[in-house]
Swiss-Prot record:
GO annotation, cellular component aspect: cytoplasm
Cited InterPro entries: GH3, GH3_C, GH3_M
Domain of life, source organism: Eukaryota
The EC number(s) this enzyme carries: 6.3.2.-
GO terms, molecular function: acid-amino acid ligase activity
PANTHER family in alphabetical order: GH3 DOMAIN-CONTAINING PROTEIN, INDOLE-3-ACETIC ACID-AMIDO SYNTHETASE GH3.6-RELATED
Protein name listed in UniProt: Probable indole-3-acetic acid-amido synthetase GH3.6
Amino acid sequence: MAATAWGIRSSGIRGASPVMSACVSPAEVILGADHQQQMYCHLLCGLRRWDAVDCIRAPYAAALARALRLLQSKWRQLCDDLECGTVCADVVTDAAMRGAVQDGVLAGPCPELAGRVRRICERDDWRGVLRQLWPDARYISCVTTGTMEQYFPAIKHFAGEALPVLGTDYLASECAIGINLERTSPPEETTYVLLPRAAYFEFIPFDMDAAGRGAAAAEPVDIAGVEAGKTYELVATTFRGLYRYKVGDVVKIAGFHHSSPRLQFVTRAPPPQEHGEVLTERDVMAAMDTFQLMLKDGGEVIEFAAFIIDGDGGQRRRRCATIAVEVSNGSKLLDHERSAAFLRRCTAPLEGCLGGAYRLSRATGDVAPLEVAVVRPGTFDRLAEAAIRGGAPANQYKPPRSSGTGTSSMCCNPPWCAAAAQSLNQLLTSICLIVSLNQRQFLDRESNSGTDKVFISDSILNFQHWGGFSLRFDLQEESLTLYKDHPS
């Protein structure tokens, strides 16, 4: 989805931006620099102007899920602000943003409205809470396919049965690709009718062979050469000058609408250097669905990411797959003594969800046993904030899902890799427990002179990572040290 401020800054016939006039938040909030403060102000403005909200929109489901988590954690403060008619300076430090909301939207205390919001939010069950807060809302609209699919159940829970969650069209930064003719379909059934005149599209046949390695045919086919049921990597030649550009998406031809193919998103295509990797986004998502079922009432999976660290040829000759999981605050998994045994029981079923490529690599000994890491609550939100501060557009940020090796970026946003390159570092420094099939454990970290050490039960490796920081596994002291710069 292309990122542009044209729709917000441009003026319509009457001199006002058509996009800005459709929002309940003032321009100072929409164009603000701090994402967390923006979300808080959006929620506050939406609650104050509750009778003017007729739909809830977000570019991606991940952004809407973050806003809902903020509503869950800050609803009491939001009610206090509504009751007093002020914006808490500790939460919103941006003076322009705070002043615009306080003077232009709140316009004085609203004790009755604050009481109404309190009565709705103080319930234990938040099913259908969005419909109760905004009874005139007709629908929720956001991207819920691909890696966004994991957020759909939570959003649907908050929306309830009476408030539909609609899918959006298939838009990329390079060009428009397809339109969604059945917007009420659940993510797993969503298809897009290709727009044949939006660009010149070609399709590279894509196959996950017996080893799970992406195998692409040398010659692409055009729109007339695709076959229903086959999987392809999408290529576009655009009117703006991109020639045979690989969009990076793998799609399945679900059928045809008249003569236009109906596309079903499958996964992101692995980068060229990672063809042959053992983890795909869909594999990891399937594993996390299983993990959530195993948790039952022991907590909720908030976010997750998977990465593979290469062996060094020494003590650790094999690559190691790790899935970092953030669970809801108060989860039993945050209790080390109770969770270690549970995680060990989980690793074997999770390995069974990781696809043929991973299972083959495990059988041949190329990959070490799976490690499941529990990171501290809020880790992925801090990761998002770091990426946004580093230049990632807030409305386009996608949480990392999987990376092939320890020498590649975990984040799905190539233009701002400088910030994304620190994602593995931030995940590792937030780890409170890692358990694998071979009984290795990473316990609480301790900070000392700018380095973070995670004590482990056996020695692993010494290995340097991306530019800007490195990892050193001390084989004698049985400790792991993360350096912000390469150690001497």
